[in-house]
C-alpha cells in the first residue's frame, strides 16, 4: 500500500471510522459507484454510506457526476475518490496538528502539574491541586509534583519532525566524521 493511499485511508478513518475506510477501498477498487452499489458491496446501510460520502465530499476527497435516467426522470449520482487535492489536504491537517502540538507544549511548559501516581487519574494544575489541598479528588492520595520533562521532550521532537516535513525548518545537519580527524592529524604532525 502506497504512502499516499495510507494517508487517504487515515483521513477517511478520521472522517467516518472503519466504515469510511471500507467505502474508500470499494471506490478505489470499482472506480465509480452509486451509493446503493457501495452499500451492497460493503454491507453498510445506504443512509450511512450517503452520510460518509457527503463528509468525504465536504473534505474534498470524493466527488460525483450526476446522470439523469431518461425513462424514469430520476438522477443517479456516481461517486469517485478525488485525490488531486490530497497533498494540500494532508498539509493542512499537518499544519493543524502542528498548531495543536505547539499549544500543548505551551501549556506543558507554562504550568506546574501535580499527580497522585495513578495513571487513570488526571494531572492537576497548581491551582487545582491547591483547591483540593494537594490531595487527589478521586483516590485521596497525596499529590506530588508531576515531572513532565518526558512529555515536553516528546512534544518538541514531534513539533520538529512536523516542521521538517512541512519545510518550515531545515533538517539537522549531520557532521562528517572524516573532517575532524584530518584537522587533528595536521596539528599532531606540527608538534
Curated annotation (Swiss-Prot):
Keywords: DNA-binding, Transcription, Transcription regulation. It holds the Pfam family TFIIE_alpha. Residues 4-87 form the HTH TFE/IIEalpha-type domain. InterPro entries: TF_E_archaea (IPR016481), TFE (IPR039997), TFIIE/TFIIEa_HTH (IPR017919), TFIIE_asu (IPR002853), TFIIEa/SarR/Rpc3_HTH_dom (IPR024550), WH-like_DNA-bd_sf (IPR036388), WH_DNA-bd_sf (IPR036390). GO terms for biological process: regulation of DNA-templated transcription; transcription initiation at RNA polymerase II promoter. The keyword Transmembrane does not apply. GO terms for molecular function: DNA binding. The keyword Glycoprotein does not apply. Residues 174-191 have a biased composition (Basic residues). Residues 170-191 are annotated as: Disordered. Transcription factor that plays a role in the activation of archaeal genes transcribed by RNA polymerase. Facilitates transcription initiation by enhancing TATA-box recognition by TATA-box-binding protein (Tbp), and transcription factor B (Tfb) and RNA polymerase recruitment. Not absolutely required for transcription in vitro, but particularly important in cases where Tbp or Tfb function is not optimal. It dynamically alters the nucleic acid-binding properties of RNA polymerases by stabilizing the initiation complex and destabilizing elongation complexes. Belongs to the TFE family. The winged helix domain is involved in binding to DNA in the preinitiation complex. Monomer. Interaction with RNA polymerase subunits RpoF and RpoE is necessary for Tfe stimulatory transcription activity. Able to interact with Tbp and RNA polymerase in the absence of DNA promoter. Interacts both with the preinitiation and elongation complexes. NCBIfam families: PRK06266.1 (NF004910), transcription factor E (TIGR00373). This is Transcription factor E.
Amino acid at each position: 500500500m502506497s504512502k499516499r493511499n495510507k494517508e487517504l485511508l487515515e483521513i477517511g478513518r478520521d472522517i467516518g471510522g472503519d466504515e469510511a475506510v471500507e467505502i474508500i477501498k470499494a471506490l478505489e477498487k470499482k472506480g465509480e459507484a452509486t451509493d446503493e452499489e457501495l452499500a451492497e458491496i460493503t454491507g453498510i446501510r445506504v443512509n450511512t454510506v450517503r452520510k460518509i460520502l457527503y463528509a468525504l465530499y465536504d473534505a474534498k476527497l470524493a466527488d460525483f457526476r450526476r446522470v439523469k435516467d431518461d425513462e424514469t426522470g430520476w438522477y443517479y449520482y456516481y461517486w469517485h475518490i478525488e485525490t488531486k487535492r490530497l497533498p494540500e489536504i494532508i498539509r493542512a491537517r499537518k499544519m493543524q496538528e502542528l498548531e495543536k502540538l505547539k499549544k500543548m507544549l505551551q501549556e506543558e511548559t507554562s504550568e506546574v502539574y501535580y499527580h497522585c501516581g495513578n495513571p487513570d487519574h488526571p494531572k492537576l494544575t497548581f491551582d487545582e491541586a491547591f483547591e483540593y489541598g494537594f490531595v487527589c479528588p478521586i483516590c485521596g492520595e497525596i499529590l506530588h509534583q508531576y515531572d513532565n520533562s518526558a512529555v515536553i521532550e516528546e512534544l518538541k521532537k514531534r513539533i520538529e519532525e512536523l516542521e521538517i516535513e512541512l519545510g518550515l525548518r531545515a533538517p539537522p545537519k549531520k557532521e562528517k566524521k572524516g573532517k575532524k580527524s584530518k584537522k587533528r592529524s595536521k596539528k599532531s604532525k606540527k608538534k
